[in-house]
Amino acid sequence: DQHGIAFSGTFITQGTGQGVVIATGEHTEIGKIAELMKATQKITTPLMKKIADFTRLLVIAVLTIAVINFLLAVLLGFDLESSFLASVSLAVAAIPEGLPAILTVTLALGVTAMARKNALIKRLPAAETLGCTTVICTDKTGTLTKNQMTVARIYSGGKEYQVSGVGYAPAGEFVSGNNTINPGEEGDELIETLKTGYMCNNASLVENNREYSILGDPTEGALVVSARKAGISSHSTKLDEIPFVAEQQYMGTLHEGAGENEHVIYVKGSPERVLKMCQDQLVNGNIVSLRSEEIHAEADSMAGGALRVLGMAYKLVPHAQNTLKPEDLDGLTFLGLQGMMDPPREEVIGAVQKCKHAGIRVVMITGDHAQTAKAIARLLDIGEDTVLTGEELSRMSDDELYEIVDTVSVFARVAPEHKFRVTKQLQRRGNIIAVTGDGVNDAPALKAADIGIAMGITGTEVSKEAADMILTDDNFASIVSAVEEGRHVFENIRKVILYTLPTNGGQSLLILGALLLAPFIYLFNPQYGGRLPIEPVQILWINLIDAVALALPLIKEPKEKGLLERPPRDPGEKIADSTFFKKVGIVSLVMALAGFIIYYYYGMPAFSGSVVDKDLIITQAQTAAFTTVMLVHICYLFTARSITESAFRFSPFSNKWVLIGAAATLGLQLAIIYALPTIGINPFRTAPLPAEWWIPMILVSLPIFFIIEFEKLLTKRWRKTKRPIT
């Protein structure tokens, strides 16, 4: 909206002139963009913040418990070595060593899935950020729309026609009222209107494997396609041309006429300019007086519908005329108007609705005119009630923008700093923002956003460098698909954490419980030949298998239904919330009880006085407790496949990796119990178990599955009762 200004980096393609340099370096528009880039710090993703907070909490808790455990053991009479080993065992049991690697693999799989849907993620954590996005700030042209101008309405001979079909494919119908018509059977003026757009034109339609594209100006391409839809495909020889120049607002061409004694001048341009050159118009095949007011009203109506409007006119001249000059363009006959627009992508309409169901607000930020932006917003159901222009934004302070930014969904005629300001104020409102952009001037906003999205086809290298994600097809619908994948990634991360932490907690509770009972039960007291229920090396093995064979398959869980029906999660929501602690407590307690019961049941006979090999009995009891803890892990795995849904609602074969992981874990456990001691390699200090011991071990392992299933049912019912009445 600035006049008489040439920006740094502008190329002059025509004419001559003089200018006064009013800014250099950082004071130019390009310089301002560079300054914005320098001033913009890339923010930490929500997941990274949560993991960092959670890690601090976990480390503090584990160290505190380990120190308390050590002091308690010393006070209870344990020697320093036993106290230290017990504390180390507890710390090893509590810390999920494999969790960082699993989180990385989960994010990597999410990135791979997004790449298959035309979204390239540059930073792994950004894959999850998409899942908690609350606002998507998107460009219009090429992202929401096809970036293919299409003629949608024609006015000719006092009649209005609708033209179907979008894009550059020459397929569509002409509709008048409620009837489909053949343009060739209407008055001459409709065909002549289409022919003028076709002849007064330098664009061409190119077909490649049934895919159509335009070679030339998109506006001229739209006129070629509308003519081709009416069956016009042949050109008469062009003799001369007055090219389009913005200042004159028209283009004229001279062609050989159909008759031997005439040539034809075709003119297209802005309705106002073309009407000034006309003296009459063609209606029903007859020359009649020019109805300027009616034509102006129709042009205004089209413009109000976000159509770019061009007027068409022609004039017959003598056969001897072979050149065309501006003065030849007086006394034209007006033919009609063609109104065209860059239509929305078909899939975007559905994608915007998905965003609404998912609780994500779509905000259009465009450099186009307010009326055009408003019309596209109306078509896409984005919300066109309030349109804020760049000029209005410039007059607002940041605090004023902050007050209204959540109520405006369309920003038009914006400059780079406006996009940047809108992004910052939306973030200030507590939103997680995804911003799209393709130009150098979009880079500051892309960098400032929680996730910057650059266009892969039309985007500049600067915008791609500043972005976290690149759309390979420049399509808004791909963003929505990536959001769904982002939510899927976070769901699987939650599943992994809610599986790993409770199982680690169960081992810790088993060690701590045994330590507290040691003064009262010889089986747990090293001073009387007793041992802890599981050894540190066994805990390390459980944690290793837990991470590789059991927790890792959870990241391959298929998407649950209705991911995009849920509202975005609260960016401030912590991983360790009340639900988390409840589940950790339940699983830890059940697992510790199962291990304790088996160890006590099979270990206490070692102190009966009639046992020949006391050490073997305790080793077998430890092996049984060790194996029971592993069995509880396997049983919990099958219910941990969903945090909220019952395991009975989906097929056990929908994730084959869970079955493979469980089978591999069981196979390795059998090898540790029976094979290694037999061949004399026994780093895990296990002993072969009698076959009949397996029945009690399995029986105490199964309850975890049903207890968690019951917990899910109660939680779901409780949430339904807490749902607000509307």
Predicted regions located by residue number:
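A C-terminal functional module that forms or caps the active site or interfaces directly
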Residues: A640
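C-terminal substrate-binding/catalytic lobe of Rossmann-fold NAD(P)-dependent dehydrogenases
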Residues: I598-P605, I618, M630
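Conserved cytosolic headpiece of P-type ATPases
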Residues: D1-P568, E573-A576, L589, F626, ...
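Membrane-interface interhelical connector segments
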Residues: A606-D615
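Membrane-water interface at loop-to-transmembrane-helix junctions
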Residues: D570-V590, D615-A624
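Alpha-helical transmembrane segments of multi-pass integral membrane proteins
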Residues: L516, K582-I598, L631, G667
